[in-house]
């Protein structure tokens, strides 16, 4: 068995030496850049710069004449919403517990036939039934 393993390892080593297995990152980057240029070549850098300049920096700033409610911080908004969330979570939890209490449990006991009604238990009852012994 070890002879076959060493033979296959040697064959693999010989193939790796012949192929000169090295990463070819330069080639893959060139291929990727060519593919991207083919796919998205219709976008020039000038067009991208023009589109970036069309979006004014003033449009990205918030309006200074807005309400105070618009300017509140995210954590303030979250703390205000916590009361509503906790009420919803409590209602959901109550409904879940009520559903669990109303529905019968799927697994009741050892088997579908009910509890064992024998004197000695399930395994001993089988042995007694086969041997003719009774309770």
UniProtKB/Swiss-Prot annotation:
Question: InterPro entries, alphabetically?
Answer: C_natriurtcpep, Natr_peptide, Natr_peptide_CS
Instruction: Name which cysteines form disulfide bonds.
Output: 119-135
Q: Name one GO cellular component term.
A: extracellular region
Q: Where is this region: Disordered?
A: 46-67
Matching entries from PROSITE patterns are given as: NATRIURETIC_PEPTIDE
Residues that make up the propeptide removed upon maturation: 26-113
Q: Where is the signal peptide?
A: 1-25
Any GO BP = receptor guanylyl cyclase signaling pathway
Alphabetized UniProt keyword annotations: Cleavage on pair of basic residues, Disulfide bond, Hormone, Secreted, Signal, Vasoactive
Where is the protein situated, by its record's location annotation?
Secreted
The UniProt GO MF terms for this protein read:
hormone activity
- Provide the function of this protein: Hormone which may be vasoactive and natriuretic. Has a cGMP-stimulating activity.
In the record, the note on similarity to other proteins reads:
Belongs to the natriuretic peptide family.
| Protein name per the record | C-type natriuretic peptide
């Amino acid at each position: 068995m070890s002879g076959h393993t060493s033979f296959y390892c040697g064959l693999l080593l010989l193939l790796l030496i012949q192929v000169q297995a090295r990463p070819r990152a330069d080639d893959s980057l060139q291929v990727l850049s060519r593919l991207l240029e083919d796919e998205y070549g219709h976008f020039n850098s000038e067009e991208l710069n023009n589109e970036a300049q069309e979006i004014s920096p003033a449009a990205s700033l918030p309006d200074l004449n807005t309400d105070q409610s618009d300017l509140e911080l995210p954590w303030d908004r979250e703390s205000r919403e916590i009361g509503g969330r906790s009420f919803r979570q409590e209602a959901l939890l109550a409904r879940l517990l009520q559903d669990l209490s109303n529905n019968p449990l799927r697994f009741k006991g050892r088997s579908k036939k009910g509890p064992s009604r024998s004197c000695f238990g399930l395994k001993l009852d089988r042995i007694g039934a086969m041997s003719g012994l009774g309770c």
